[in-house]
Each structure stands twice: as C-alpha cells, then as structure tokens.
Amino acid sequence: MFTGSIVALVTPMDEKGNVSRSCLKKLIDYHVANGTSAIVSVGTTGESATLSHDEHGDVVMMTLELADGRIPVIAGTGANATAEAISLTQRFNDSGIVGCLTVTPYYNRPTQEGLFQHFKAIAEHTDLPQILYNVPSRTGCDMLPETVGRLAEIKNIIAIKEATGNLTRVHQIKELVSDDFILLSGDDASALDFMQLGGHGVISVTANVAARDMADMCKLAAEGQFAEARAINQRLMPLHNKLFVEPNPIPVKWACKALGLVATDTLRLPMTPITDHGRDIVKAALQHAGLL
C-alpha cells in the first residue's frame, strides 16, 4: 500500500467553495478502477492550507467512508507547530487510515536537530505509520539525508516522500536506512528515474488525471521493465511539467474538471483560477498524453 502510484488527491469543491461529497466519491471510484495504490487525503494538492482543522478532519473521514475499504487512505497531518501536528495525527489514531504524510515544518525553518525532534515527537504520540515529506521548494526547509537516517531508526517512521527532484538523494538516503525503509518520489517528472535508482513509487499529482498510466508505469518499473515504463513516462512528461505551470493545485484542478472528474475547478483564496494562458498549456499536455 505504500509503494507504486499513490495519488495526492485534489479536494473537490462546489462553486461556493464547499467540499463536494459527490465529486469526491467520483474521484475515489476512478482511482479504485484504475489501479492507484493508495490515496493521500488533504495534502498540499488537497489544499490543506486553506481548510480549517475541522474541515481537514472531515475530508479525511469522508474519504475513508467513501473508499469503504477499497483503497488505502493516508492522511496529510503536517503542521509547522509540533503540537499541532501531533493533534492532527492523533485525531486519526483509530480512524482506519493506514498512515500519515507529515511535511517538514514550513516558514519557521527549523535546524536539522529541530526537524529530528519534531518528527520524533509526532511518532512517539501515535502508532500510525509515518511518512516523512521533504519539499524545500514549498517549505523553505530541506531535511538532509543524515536526518532522515536518524529518523528511520524510529519504529513507526517507515517512509519518506522526497520531493527535491535531486536524484542523488536516493543514493544518499539508501546508504543510511534499512532495506525495508520506503523511498517515494514527490516529483512526477523524475519519478521513474527515482524508481530505477531504487525508489519504491511516487506520491503523484499527475495520477489525479492519468491514474491508469501512472499505475502501469510504476508496476512496470517494479518489474524491471524500464523500457516499457519509459514509453509511458515520455508520453506523460509534458503533463508532469505543465501541471506546475501555475502553483499546484491550480492546474491539476482545472485538468480534473476538463476530464469530467470534478464539476468545478473552484479553489479558495489566496489560490485563484487558472489563467487562459495556463489553461491552454495544460490542455495541450493533456492532449499529448492522449487524455483529452
């Protein structure tokens, strides 16, 4: 459940910005039907930053309910205050989620020791499996391989989503962790190379609109069929890149709407709808991928 193509799921909203239960069910059904390994609910792509704490919990629980055991659900539980991250995590202790994705604290830029103590404290307050999440472009904070190695010794810290796009990190981390520690790419464009170097899968934005392709690519990579996997990846490469032509999740929400997976591409301020220029770029990438 922690390998292969794991989708960083968008949070669908109606025109008033309320979470759409019917569209969420449609998205979950789509991923169940198309081989996605697991869902990350309310991560960055799921607009965690603009949901209230109550809404955050409600969306995760709604996702669990609608998934109904058909696909594993991972909850995003990151925060830039350790106590808040612990509180979010503990809310899901007996919920049925299979684990938590916890981003490095953003904005306050802790030291490496601060990062270690942050994740250690969270792990000590739950039995849920923890996936570390390193995305310096978003947080202003880079968790170094040596810190990951220290954290990997904690029993319920089982994986990392490494989203720097720096492939040398795969080698650096693998040298410092046990063989059962899971390495997940957080960068669709380099995910296949990441897996070829020993990674186990990807937490994917692209999978929101290309679930079957991403699942097939990851399966082929796991089986060592990299030529076949690369053929899929090359077709998707413009999409991997152009889904970030404007800040995530602006482009991918529009793409979901364009494919009929959600009813609207509504976002909450300060996120604004995609520009006409951005829409044209994403549309061309969807067409190149054979999705539109």
UniProtKB/Swiss-Prot annotation:
One of its GO terms (cellular component) is cytosol. The record marks T44, Y107 as: Part of a proton relay during catalysis. The lineage of its organism: Bacteria, Pseudomonadati, Pseudomonadota, Gammaproteobacteria, Enterobacterales. This is 4-hydroxy-tetrahydrodipicolinate synthase. Signal peptide: none annotated. It comes from Salmonella typhi. Pathway: Amino-acid biosynthesis; L-lysine biosynthesis via DAP pathway; (S)-tetrahydrodipicolinate from L-aspartate: step 3/4. Its EC number is 4.3.3.7. SUPFAM superfamilies: Aldolase (SSF51569).
